[in-house]
């Protein structure tokens, strides 16, 4: 091989003429481009060899690469940028080799803000923070439709040239979002309330995804207002619309069931002052494919209009904006919850009988990436209603791992809800009526409150709690429904595993078994016992599996009343918190596939000893053919005379016409049976005809018409089976026999 290596240069010098010509052209072109370095274009061999060697050398020395780098240097667009930005006050530019950094000068006094407002129909804010692992995981399966929600009011606004806002300083962004100035010409309804100071650290993601304290002046909390004009268009991008559009006013009255503008909560709603943004969001979301994400519970501010919004749109209040679509913004810069790696569950603490909990634990143990989303507690006073909405989404996303807090939380929710019960219900109803599209029956906050109250009462059905608690520890959705409550001390903790859908499916599968008639979580309508499917159809081929709430409170309905209304209430809570009206809509309009009863997920990565797909039917019998050297003569048996005699009657008619002469030729009684078969040996398995398989009564088919042979085998087999066979040895057939063997004890195999 070394010799070959040494010879390598030789072939290069003797390269074919066509290759040499190509090289010459290339070099000539290079020379012309590089400014007259064409002297090297001589076609002599050594030069060409050098060119080839050079082209195979390091990239930095590659003539083509050199040429390209020189060409790029000539244009120097970065230089123009530098010069341009150097003249901008308050902007500092730093130039590295291939990087140009333009940032606001730290010490530079901020420019005097224009009339406290942005004069644009839409402002696009881009945010750069890298999404966390969970965000990336979720976005990987996120539907791309997120940016434009169908029917979202924003879509219908005049699209003015968007103003990308440099994300250089969060402070700048924040004011932008916060204070679409009252002066802004677009604002139609009410001047923006005084801009509430927002910490610079707060990010757009937070702005869009978390509840913010309501304005002290009673105007809608920044969160509510923000959702009014903030639309998330990407993992870290938002489109900002001026607040105060008429739609907001309309939505305000209708959409925020709990937070109706009139709601006594007043500023706390953060919705009263400004149009209930959540409602607007909801319409967007609603119009959007209902099932895109597990709708944040209707209670979320975005979903505040309890009735229509199928998903709480990524309203600020939504603790976990619909987990899939807005997750990155929510997780990357969100003060509503924090993400921690989840600890591995302790299998010893799980009761052996709790199969679901153990399967979930096993799943989590084997999961490569498991995270816990822990909601951060906020002062409920800021947005009593919003808080509840905020919580609901969490319920949707999170697995309530703290059922104990449920009672108090429920109570608080109930207390906060009474005001909502009246107006929100009516508003919701109106909203639903106007929004004919929103299938979800207006589930008034009152209803929710009532439902919550029910669970608040000590759950009599706690038998399931034993099972539920371990599961909750593992991230079994516990009080997710309850999560809809206003922010409560015990917030549900969400576990996100890389394979969470399997867990969810498993839980769902298990729950249906526990409660046969339990309505699916998804209906927001009084759950119908028939709907057990936990699958939320998110698009044409995507199904989101939302785990059924398994906490004792929820299970009470499941266990006590399979079909009862109480079950309905609990399930409805489930549905609301988990899916929202969208799911309901989908349930009513689309065929759910598959239903929960059809899905049984036993564990994500659990290795099953036996596949559950194996079809072991009595009809499928294996035919085992074995040859024992010591008893070969018993391997091939002929049916006994009596069995053949019985068959004869049946088969004579079929085979009479065929080979009559042959049948008569057979003389001995022992061979008479073969007349039926047209003197052919029948091979019977050694076990006897009972095991009649394909070979139990075999007649060489090449010797008779195929149709006859088919009929014969069909008829023979059943009769053969009835009587024990008679052992016979096989001897070579005589000339006049059609079969290859006859039964005369002469030849042993």
From Swiss-Prot:
Residues 169-179, 230-239, 250-266, 323-335, 534-544, 558-570 have a biased composition (Polar residues). Reducing Tprn expression corrects stereocilium morphological defects and partially restores hearing in Grxcr2 mutant mice. It is found in: Cell projection, Stereocilium; Cell projection, Microvillus; Nucleus, Nucleoplasm; Cytoplasm. GO terms for biological process: auditory receptor cell stereocilium organization; sensory perception of sound; stereocilium maintenance. One of its GO terms (molecular function) is actin binding. Belongs to the taperin family. InterPro entries: Phostensin/Taperin_N_dom, Phostensin/Taperin_PP1-bd_dom, PPP1R18/Tprn. Residues 337-347 have a biased composition (Basic and acidic residues). Essential for hearing. Required for maintenance of stereocilia on both inner and outer hair cells. Necessary for the integrity of the stereociliary rootlet. May act as an actin cytoskeleton regulator involved in the regulation of actin dynamics at the pointed end in hair cells. Forms rings at the base of stereocilia and binds actin filaments in the stereocilia which may stabilize the stereocilia. Acts as a strong inhibitor of PPP1CA phosphatase activity. Recruited to sites of DNA damage and may play a role in DNA damage repair. Interacts with GRXCR2; the interaction restricts TPRN to the stereocilum basal region. Interacts with actin ACTB; the interaction may stabilize stereocilia. Interacts with CLIC5. Interacts with PTPRQ. TPRN, CLIC5 and PTPQR form concentric rings at the base of stereocilia and may form a complex. Interacts with phosphatase PPP1CA; the interaction results in inhibition of PPP1CA phosphatase activity. Interacts with DNA damage response proteins XRCC6/KU70, XRCC5/KU80, PARP1, TOP1 and TOP2A; these interactions recruit TPRN to sites of DNA damage where it may play a role in DNA repair. In the organ of Corti, expressed in the inner ear hair cell stereocilia and the supporting cells (at protein level). Expressed in the sensory epithelia of the organ of Corti and vestibular end organs and, to a lesser extent, in Reisner's membrane and the spiral ligament (at protein level). At postnatal day 2, expression is detected in cochlea, liver, brain, kidney, heart and lung. This is Taperin. Disruption phenotype: Progressive hearing loss with progressive stereocilium degeneration, defects in stereociliary rootlets and mechanotransduction defects of the stereocilia. Fused stereocilia are observed in inner hair cells. Abnormal stereocilium distribution of actin-binding protein Rdx with diffuse Rdx expression throughout the stereocilium rather than concentration at the stereocilium base as in the wild-type. Significantly reduced levels of Rdx and Actb in the cochlea at postnatal day 30. Adult mice show almost complete deafness with slight to severe hair cell loss with aging. The gene is Tprn. Residues 647-668 have a biased composition (Acidic residues). The modification Phosphoserine is found at residues 274, 401, 457, 501. Keywords: Actin-binding, Cell projection, Cytoplasm, Hearing, Nucleus, Phosphoprotein, Protein phosphatase inhibitor. Residues 144-348, 502-586, 636-673, 730-749 are annotated as: Disordered. GO terms for cellular component: cytoplasm; cytosol; microvillus; nucleoplasm; stereocilium; stereocilium base.
